[in-house]
Amino acid sequence: INPSKMTSGSSLKYRKYLMNVDFDDYIRSHNPDAIALAERTLKAATNNSINGAGLDSVKLANIIGKLYMNNNETEKLLVNAQFNSLFDSIKKNLQEEHERLIDEWAKNGSNPKNKPLDPFNVIATIDVSGSMSGANVINPAVLLGIIVTKLSTVGNFFITFSENPTIVTINPEDNIFDIFSLVM
């Protein structure tokens, strides 16, 4: 098995198998093939070559929400690589669509009133109020807010929406778990 060639859904679903651990994070097998697969998976995750482009962001957000307090750094590395792949895919698609719209606008006379908005000129607001936790949607809200923040050309910050709103600054180079912990 080549972890870099797996579909994003498969590598997320079977991440523990790929890393040769059981559900309690103990070594699953001492078989040399299982150990070699875990080493290939770790190398692929370290190189950010694990596919995540087609992931369901809600599923990924809920896994990140469960793992961010976990000490399994290898699993976090794999999930972070998948997040990076998903983010890169979103950014690329958004850039391509914006360029297409700008080209179309230019071909149609470049009327300033109809100029497409820059999708990167945004500030995220993340709802972290109690109702989000109660509705079990806080993890997806946080993940999507982080994605918008990382895409933004305005700055590396977002505003929390809660009883005590705050401005949170992120380092976009940090892994998703470090950024996630700033919100939770």
Regions found by a protein language model. Name each.
Residues 1-140, 150-184:
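Long lumenal/extracellular ectodomains of secretory and single-pass membrane proteins
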